[in-house]
Amino acid sequence: MARVFISFAMEDKSLRDFLVGQKRNARTSIDFTDYSVKEPWSSSWKTNCRQRIKTCRGMIGIITPNTPKADGQLWELKCAIDEGVTLMLIHGYNASERKLSTLPTVISGRQVNLWTEDNIVNFLNRLG
């Protein structure tokens, strides 16, 4: 089972909870160990967060209209890129009016996938 860091804007915590809930559903093939940060840490959170990200096989970034203002999430995404952690971005919402038209600089040019079981399972399978 792959160890995965889930990056999300704190305003989108319910989406992270939903993704973790999907893996608990016996009818899905989604299986991973959630290593996301659930609560903001103290002033040393970046050091702790970087260590946690480095120990993961991959990161799933949940991208929503809250992402551009989410300094912590943007830092996590940049950290994963800098550390060479395999990254998959998914839209938090599949409705076109809730998708970002312009991605933040740190992830500009990267593909943002639809949030589907197949996309997530394929990503997890690539992690080994």
Describe each model-derived feature in a short phrase.
Residues 1-55, 92-93, 128:
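Conserved N-terminal substructure of TIR/SEFIR domains
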Residues 58-61:
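Inter-motif core of Ras-like GTPase G domains
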Residues 66-85:
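Conserved TIR/SEFIR loop-to-helix hotspot centered on a Trp-containing motif
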Residues 118-128:
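A charged, well-structured terminal subsegment
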Residues 87-97:
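Short beta-alpha junction loops
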Residues 108-118:
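Short acidic-hydrophobic, aromatic-tinged amphipathic segments that line or gate anion-handling sites
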Residues 24-28, 79-89:
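Arginine/glycine-rich "motif VI" loop of SF2 helicases in the C-terminal RecA-like domain
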Residues 95-109:
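Glycine-rich, charge-decorated loop segments at or immediately adjacent to ligand/cofactor-binding or catalytic sites
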